[in-house]
Amino acid sequence: VDLRQEPPPLIIGERLNTQGSRRAKELVLANDFDGLVGLARAQVEDGAHCLDVCVATTERSDELEFMTRLVKRLSLEIDAPLVIDSTDPKVVEAAVKQIPGRPIVNSINLEGDGSRFQALAPLMAKYGLPAIAMCIGPKGMAKTAQEKLDTAQLLYDTGKKYGLQAWQFIFDVLTFTLATGEAEFADSAKNTLEGIRMLKQKFPESFTTLGLSNVSFGLPASARKVVNSVFLYHALKAGLDTVIINARDVIPYPEIDEQQKKLAEDLIFNKHTNALAELITHFEGAKAVATGSTKRIEVDPSWPADKRSYFRIVNRLKEGIEDDVVQAIADRVKGVKLVRQEGRLVLKAPTKETAHEAAVETLNEVLLPAMKEVGDKFGAGELILPFVLKSAECMKAAVAELEKYLIRQE
């Protein structure tokens, strides 16, 4: 997998991490390797390019042995690169030796005496490994944009002493929760966005990343998806290359309710002193559902079939698309009959030729333009890859139904 996705981001799945996922911790404590592999597979199906793997717990002391067994299973059964997440360099090296390809190391920093970086840098040089480089220096976590840039420069310069190349640095610019209301962190999201811009300008051959959900930690569950999704949109605009998230928890930016979008952006950009209170009041007062989408997206049965088909592809509403496509074809044919067979609409056209022509028109006038809109939104950063893949699944189902009415050319 190329670290530089076009368009970005490279998605690093965060659920296989005992420090942040209750489910992952339960599976580790239960020695449930099958369950962990299943959790990994589900993230890949949801659109993750890579998987963060952390198995450390306070309840058990066999992190090295457990990590070694797990990454061996994952390497054999999951088609996705791994991100080895451990504070113990010995665990990282043991895991690296079990993986046929090149994993990402998570993470290096220069906290304290820099001993962690000193232990891992030779390993990175030996195996040619990239690493998430946290913007943490001798003075602690970098908070202002300039501090982030200065710390990244220190990380980079230190790495060069070990022979590390620019592409081996994935700078975590750090993001802090906006839920505390503390003045110290009121501009933290703005500083993160500006830090991304500054690092991308200074280190064009390196990469940037964020543990995105940190920005909303402590907010009501119903608000977190909105804040995370809005922040991701602006981070990508700033130049973010990779992101550590649960792809399932992201809402496409155009689908976020305008009022909720404004509340989130007021908080992220610290537009006024009541931004946090207003956001919390809105989400707690409205008792918004914690499951996500802020706009109810439905197909109106009264719409013409062309519009229904187009809408389903753009908005990833696969169920029912076959009938809508058949109806769209039928609307282009005179003297057509529609019957329902085994629960599906079937077209009975006067001739195969008329059905063929109508199917081609439907493809060119409805289905292909719908996928073009999806592609345009992807290119503009309004959609991330998992949503494009779901639209592609709708397109595939639509074309499979449409092909029944095409005349095969010998």
Question: Which residues fall in each region the model found?
Answer:
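Domain-level signal for soluble alpha/beta catalytic cores
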Residues: 1-410
